[in-house]
From Swiss-Prot:
InterPro entries: AAA+_ATPase, ABC_carbohydrate_import_ATPase, ABC_transporter-like_ATP-bd, ABC_transporter-like_CS, P-loop_NTPase
UniProt-listed Enzyme Commission number(s): 7.5.2.7
Annotated catalysed reactions: D-ribose(out) + ATP + H2O = D-ribose(in) + ADP + phosphate + H(+)
Family: Belongs to the ABC transporter superfamily. Ribose importer (TC 3.A.1.2.1) family.
Start and end residues of each ABC transporter domain: 3-239, 246-493
Gene3D superfamilies, per database record: P-loop containing nucleotide triphosphate hydrolases
UniProt-recorded name of the protein: Ribose import ATP-binding protein RbsA
Species, as recorded: Bacillus subtilis (strain 168)
Transmembrane segments: none
Name of the coding gene: rbsA
Residues at which ATP binds: 35-42
Signal peptide range in chain numbering: none
Top-rank lineage group of the source organism: Bacteria
Length: 493
């Protein structure tokens, strides 16, 4: 299938989202669509699949002018969109998820389960996926759920699959599996639109790249004819001199220490510390127990055994409220479900953990609150028309900045960052890194969990590696390599 989008314009209210965007997709190619958060990538694909209607512009499919009125119609014509938030019903079986709304029944209305299972198995075999059709989809890993979505798309005879941040929550093994599947689909003439911020993946799997900036097409080129620096420059409109801004660490005393901490079934006998002004990176494969550790240290989950020491004093943290009072902040990996109130304003999200600062006598001083929020919006360069904009309407990078702003506002001594730049574009990433460095200069201790090895290597002073719920090693940043980290993460020595 060949797709041509020409001079596409789209406005939401007063906000011009797309201004004359053009995009072309050839049969059997993997085409990267890149741009900073808010550049208009998802809006463009939503117009293609009929979720939104363009104000102006032309869409041609195989040379014929074509417009879809809704995503289901696009799917019926062979175009499937796999969103970053997967469309999976966790309490239903794998089979039920595959055939939801497309069940096969006899003339008497009896479900033909055997026939559906045969068709499902046929698709899974094509994808080399081994998965029980009777298990609940919620029991599957994110990588397996993604394969369910791909199989679902292929069962509608999809010729084009749009993938939005497909590897954001995948393990290294699942990413390799996804790339194998994409390569096989490509050989069968299926085209892939690959929306991602992960530059390494773009250069590994894609044939061409279209770069967008501020709702416009900047360039379309063959991957073989460009490089990392050129793509970044076109995305952000300027050169980023360094991917990871340099800093000279000034390390103080231990401000946070964990001794022999365990939570049954999650992690065991964990001990580590972080000093003021230090960034400790926590690396490991997905499922190793890193997030579970951070949740327990912040009081979200209860420790079974172990001790927590803050500024040299043994303390107990029974819940997040106690953690905040004792100077801890926690930026969760799941910003949409746990980090933000999506249908609440930016102002309310940022002010929420800081309400006591604006209400010394029980009444909120709205002037002080507004000044505080405006200061943080400017400081973190959160792109918004108003502090009253609901968090739901922000791009991924700006949502993450709101989460960071609300925790910076409490003035933490120790800040836990769990996947701080997941789903964030390269420009916003660098802004977050710069902010982390500024916080350490003020003496804040940072614990950073990340699945991106370049980020771990580029930002950490020390690196703790977790394997199957235990700390398998600790490396100073000067001695760390990707190979050494991966060896420890997979149980090697």
């Amino acid at each position: 299938m060949q797709i041509e989008m020409k001079d596409i314009h789209k406005t939401f209210g007063k906000n011009q989202v797309l201004s004359g965007v053009s995009f072309q997709l050839m049969p059997g190619e993997v085409h990267a669509l890149m741009g900073e958060n808010g550049a208009g990538k998802s809006t463009l694909m939503n117009i293609l699949t009929g979720l939104h209607k363009a104000d102006k512009g032309q869409i041609s499919i195989n040379g014929n002018e074509t417009y879809f009125s809704n995503p289901k119609e696009a799917e019926q014509h062979g175009i499937a969109f796999i969103h970053q938030e997967l469309n999976i019903w966790p309490e239903m079986t794998v089979l039920e998820n595959l055939f939801i709304g497309k069940e096969i029944s006899s003339k008497l209305g009896v479900l033909q389960t055997r026939k559906m299972k045969a068709l499902a198995k046929e698709q899974f075999d094509k994808l080399s996926v081994s998965l029980s059709l009777d298990q609940e989809a919620g029991e599957c890993s994110v990588g397996q759920q993604q394969m369910i979505e791909i199989a679902k798309a292929l069962m509608t005879n999809a010729e084009v699959i749009i993938m939005d941040e497909p590897t954001a929550a995948l393990t290294e093994r699942e990413i390799s599996k996804l790339f194998e599947v994409i390569t096989a689909l490509k050989k069968n003439g299926v085209s892939i639109v690959y929306i991602s911020h992960r530059m390494e993946e773009i250069f590994a799997i894609c044939d061409r790249i279209t770069i967008m900036r501020d709702g416009k097409t900047v360039d379309t080129t063959n991957i073989s004819e460009t490089d990392f620096d050129e793509v970044v420059k076109k995305m952000v409109g300027r050169e980023l001199t360094e991917r990871y801004p340099k800093r000279t660490p000034s390390l103080g005393d231990k401000v946070f220490e964990v001794k022999n901490a365990s939570v049954k079934g999650s992690f065991e006998d964990v001990s580590f510390y972080v000093r003021s002004g230090e960034i400790v990176g926590v690396s490991g494969l997905m499922g190793a127990g890193r997030t579970e550790m951070m949740r327990a240290l912040f009081g979200v989950d209860r420790l079974d055994t172990g001790e927590i020491w803050i500024a040299g004093k043994k303390t107990a943290i029974k819940n997040p409220q106690e953690a905040v009072k004792k100077g801890l902040g926690f930026i969760t990996e799941n910003r949409k479900d746990e980090g933000l109130l999506l249908d609440t304003s930016i102002r309310e999200n940022i002010a929420l953990p800081n309400l006591s600062s604006f209400s010394p006598k029980g009444l909120i001083d709205h002037k002080r609150e507004a000044e505080f929020v405006d200061l943080l919006i400017k400081r973190l360069t959160i792109k918004t028309a108003s502090p009253e904009t609901h968090a739901r309407h922000l791009s991924g990078g700006n949502q993450q900045k709101v989460v960071i702003a609300k925790w910076i506002g409490i003035g933490p001594k120790v800040l836990i960052l769990d996947e701080p730049t997941r789903g964030v574009d390269v420009g916003a990433k660098r802004e977050i890194y710069t902010l982390m460095n500024e916080l350490t200069e003020r003496g804040v201790a940072i614990i950073m969990v990340s699945s991106e090895l370049p980020e771990i290597l580029g930002m950490s002073d020390r690196i703790i590696v977790v394997h199957e719920g235990r700390i398998s090693g600790e490396i100073h940043a000067r001695e760390a390599t990707q190979e050494r980290i991966m060896t420890l993460a997979t149980g090697g020595r």
